[in-house]
Swiss-Prot record:
The gene is MT-CYB. It is found in: Mitochondrion inner membrane. One of its GO terms (molecular function) is metal ion binding. Coiled coil: none annotated. The chain crosses the membrane at residues 33-53, 77-98, 113-133, 178-198, 226-246, 288-308, 320-340, 347-367. It comes from the Eukaryota. The keyword Manganese does not apply. Heme 1 (or BL or b562) is low-potential and absorbs at about 562 nm, and heme 2 (or BH or b566) is high-potential and absorbs at about 566 nm. This is Cytochrome b. Disulfide bonds: none annotated. Component of the ubiquinol-cytochrome c reductase complex (complex III or cytochrome b-c1 complex) that is part of the mitochondrial respiratory chain. The b-c1 complex mediates electron transfer from ubiquinol to cytochrome c. Contributes to the generation of a proton gradient across the mitochondrial membrane that is then used for ATP synthesis. Keywords: Electron transport, Heme, Iron, Membrane, Metal-binding, Mitochondrion, Mitochondrion inner membrane, Respiratory chain, Transmembrane, Transmembrane helix, Transport, Ubiquinone. Heme b b562 binds at residue 182.
Length: 381
């Protein structure tokens, strides 16, 4: 009798995706993050679903409902801590996943890469609207500052901002619609993740060497299921350590105060995973220029496949490109640090220097390094 998983219409899809999938024999732990992101998404959806059962999206009761969840709902404190810190783990995995893609040249699978960038933008949108929901000071002012950026768009900006707000400022209508967006977006992310996998399985995975691995494939199960399980254990360990021992480590103390439109916090800043983009936004004195730089800092990922000049796919054997990659990483860490600092010297100039370096690194220096490495590897005799 033929194995049911190979014949049943539904099980067959699962089998071809997670069991009998031919995978390169040499993919490292950097290839674990896809499955970890899937787990993060499921954790966020499940904890979010239970939180939504007790949350009220009204300006008068939103803050109190979150306090009620933490105090009175069975394990409500745990749900909230897992949800808040799960978002941080989600973004850690996302950034590492994107970094892996850049380092090993995975972006040359253009469809998979472009869907991935759309996924990144969708997750960022979801996290932003989610941060507004507890209706603390930083929630309210973060929403006000970021949505207000839309007003920088010429001609239609103010109308657009008021349309998003549902009024003349961030208020009850804004909170209600943000809750609706925050509920629906994770399911859109799930659908996009399926499309992402669909495109990936059309070509098969890349591998650290960047060489076509078709001659040496192994089944996904048990080799990579057990490898992913190890990554999963480490992820859950980190998440639980964060959620149980220092749940407020990555949050903002201002968010423990209810939203007050009459009192502006001394330093408005988003969650840590948006700080790099926020630093780029702030480093440009012009409002519209800042908004364009903010968008460009993320959308630049879409043109990375067009900037690939090297004969080799991966950076594994390209030391100059490797050096530039790690300079880019250090640059992003610097921007993240600057985004969390007040707008004063020396932070202003450091932020401007880091922002100025970010774009030439990707647009000029890395493609030039690829060409230089091609020249160095050409036989000269």
């Amino acid at each position: 009798m033929i194995n049911m998983r190979k014949t049943h219409p539904l099980l067959k899809i699962i089998n071809h995706s997670f069991i009998d999938l031919p995978a390169p024999s040499n993919i490292s732990a950097w290839w674990n993050f896809g499955s970890l992101l899937g787990v993060c998404l499921m954790i966020q959806i499940l904890t979010g679903l239970f939180l939504a059962m007790h949350y009220t999206s009204d300006t008068l009761t939103a803050f109190s409902s979150v306090a009620h969840i933490c105090r009175d709902v069975n394990h409500g404190w745990l749900l909230r801590n897992l949800q808040a810190n799960g978002a941080s783990m989600f973004f850690m995995c996302l950034f590492l996943h994107v970094g892996r893609g850049i380092y090993y040249g995975s972006y040359l699978y253009k469809e998979t890469w472009n869907i991935g960038v759309i996924l990144l933008l969708t997750v960022m949108a979801t996290a932003f609207v989610g941060y507004v929901l507890p209706w603390g000071q930083m929630s309210f002012w973060g929403a006000t500052v970021i949505t207000n950026l839309l007003s920088a768009i010429p001609y239609i900006g103010t109308t657009l901002a008021e349309w998003i707000w549902g009024g003349f400022a961030v208020d009850k209508a804004t909170l209600t619609r943000f809750f609706a967006f925050h509920f629906i977006l994770p399911f859109i992310i799930m659908a996009l993740a399926v499309v992402h996998l669909l495109f990936l399985h059309e070509t098969g995975s890349n591998n650290p060497s960047g060489i076509n691995p078709d001659s040496d494939k192994i089944p996904f199960h048990p080799y990579y299921t057990i490898k992913d399980a190890l990554g999963l254990m480490l992820l859950l360990l980190m998440l639980l350590l964060l959620a149980l021992f220092s749940p407020d480590l990555l949050g903002d103390p201002d968010n423990f105060s209810p939203a007050n439109p009459l009192n502006t916090p001394p330093h408005i800043k988003p969650e840590w995973y948006f700080l790099f983009a926020y630093a780029i936004l702030r480093s440009i004195p012009n409002k519209l220029g800042g908004v364009l730089a903010l968008l460009a800092s993320i959308l630049i990922l879409l043109i990375i496949p067009l900037l690939h000049t090297a004969n080799q796919r991966s950076m594994m054997f390209r030391p100059i490109s490797q050096t530039l990659f790690w300079i880019l990483t250090a640059n992003l860490i610097t921007l993240t640090w600057i985004g969390g600092q007040p707008v004063e010297q020396p932070f202003i100039i450091i932020g401007q220097l880091a922002s100025t370096l970010y774009f030439p690194l990707i647009l000029i220096l890395m493609p030039s390094a690829g060409l230089l490495e091609n020249y160095m590897l050409e036989p000269k005799w």
